[in-house]
From Swiss-Prot:
The gene is SDR3b. NAD(+) binds at residues 12-36. It comes from the Eukaryota. This is Short-chain dehydrogenase reductase 3b. It is an enzyme of class 1 (oxidoreductase).
Length: 257
């Protein structure tokens, strides 16, 4: 489909300062959206907004584990632009790989607080804003192949993403009567700062590892591929799609369950 697929849409992207989030900010604004970048990485987030143009993107500091800050981020967006059409809840963390015998419960709590509870808070307040304005909006959440397959990521991360998939399904059921869609986008291993730092690997090593275990050969998974899937779910092209988890994994989760 040609043309600007989010023309006139107002979007919040959490975790928008780097990685998949930053790539999505760029792609969404290319397609006509005005985006509020939500993150705790202030310098990076502000730099992304400036590089795109502050008429198209703005930055708002928000810790997703703090519900008051989440509510304020949504209020900021609605006050600035008059509405909210799309939430791309992408903020997340990944803890170190350890045996379940050595599981650090503090790390587990932090991962779940950001990846799952933070997303729940944003869905709650974004949906409220959409309902109040009569917006038939779209909510997209970054899940993972780890949302359905164990053994590909640390225990806390895997647990949080399994829970997030349940939240997506539950929220889609509760928000359908308002015309609000809720979906997930589930990438395989992308060489983002989050993954590289979490696994202590250089980007080329992450890509080599992903390509070696991938089902689909001859292509390297990039953040742009995930952003393009999120764009589809955010746009009206997916107008009758809700409660789904769109895998961007080259068939990995199908052939290696």
């Amino acid at each position: 489909m040609s043309g600007k697929r989010l023309d006139g849409k107002i979007v919040i992207i959490t975790g928008g300062a780097s990685g998949i989030g930053a790539e999505s900010v760029r792609l969404f604004t290319e397609h006509g959206a005005r985006v509020v970048i939500v993150d705790v990485q202030d310098e990076l987030g502000q730099n992304v907004a400036v590089s795109i143009g502050e008429d198209k993107a703005s930055y708002y500091h928000c810790d997703v584990t703090n519900e008051t800050e989440v509510e304020n981020a949504v209020k900021f967006t609605v006050e600035k632009y008059g509405k909210l059409d799309v939430l791309f809840s992408n903020a997340g963390v990944i803890e170190p790989f350890v045996s379940i015998l050595d599981l650090n419960l503090n790390e587990l709590d932090r991962t779940i607080a950001i990846n799952l509870r933070g997303t729940a808070a944003f869905i709650k307040h974004a949906a409220r804003a959409m309902v109040e304005k009569g917006i038939r909006g779209s909510i997209v959440c970054t899940t993972s192949v780890a949302a359905e397959i164990a053994g590909t990521a640390p225990h806390g991360y895997t647990t949080s993403k399994h829970g997030l998939l349940g939240l997506i399904k539950s929220a889609s059921g509760g928000l359908g009567k308002y015309g609000i869609r809720v979906n997930g986008v589930a990438p395989f291993g992308v060489a983002t700062p989050l993954v590289c730092n979490g696994f202590k690997m250089e980007p080329n090593v992450v890509e080599q590892n992903t390509s070696a275990s991938a089902n689909l050969k001859g292509i390297v998974l990039k953040a742009r591929h995930v952003a393009e899937a999120a764009l589809f779910l955010a746009s009206d092209e997916s107008a009758y799609v809700s409660g789904q988890n769109l895998a961007v994994d080259g068939g990995y989760s199908v052939v290696k369950p």
